[in-house]
Amino acid sequence: MACGNGHNAEGRYAGVAPEAGIVSVKILDRYGQGNSTHAVLGLRWIMDNAHKYNIKVVNLSIGTNDRKVNLPLKEAVERLWQMGIVVVAAAGNPDGRNGYRPPPAVSGGVISVGAWEDRSYFLAPAFPLFSRERDVLPDLWAPGEDIISVLSPDFDFTLPNRSRKNIVDENYITMSGASMATPLISGAAALLLAENPHTRPAEIKRLLLQKAKPFGGLLTAEVCRTI
């Protein structure tokens, strides 16, 4: 979604920044499960190897409901931000509890992303289906419903909100949520950096917010903006 080149899809599906390189850092198990300790270790690996692999943007389509792990994740992403690396994090999905931006999206050193679906625009003043509506709103919203993504051979269909009906073909599947919206913003950040490689993260964030459009019918244009 962020930088797929569409090779496996014969050009039918491509990411926002298809010429960007990908450095995969494994912090989850084969079933997509993990913990904050592994997440922090992964972020520290990026700190140590950012120059070697020319890492400019970090996409974090992860989150936790455990606020006790806030500090180590917050410190790790803010360190990356200070190093000049743009960090883009999913702002979470509603689950019946009080809404808030979960770690690591709660940090000031990130661009936090919520997801919107087409119907949300016409349900004002309701909030987007896939984004938390209280406490702190995401910096940006991006499309997050039925997004086509790569299908892993180990994809666990026994987990909630996963269905074989979403399979597109042997290589692709559609999924929904903030984790799917986040790579779209990461790709947009990569495009900005391709034009101006030395731009600092705060300026990338400012440019994205500046170019985003007010999300019609949701609160005010100042706090609800979408790409």
Name these PLM-found stretches.
Residues M1-N5, V25-D29, L60-T64, A89-P94, ...:
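Active-site-proximal beta-strand/loop segments in catalytic clefts of secreted hydrolases
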Residues M1-T37, Y53-K56, V69, V106-V110, ...:
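Subtilisin-like serine protease catalytic core
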Residues C3-H7, R44-H51, E78-Q82, A115-D118, ...:
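Sec-exported extracytoplasmic/periplasmic mature domains
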Residues A9, I27-G109, S120, N166-T182:
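Substrate-binding/access-modulating region of protease and related hydrolase catalytic domains
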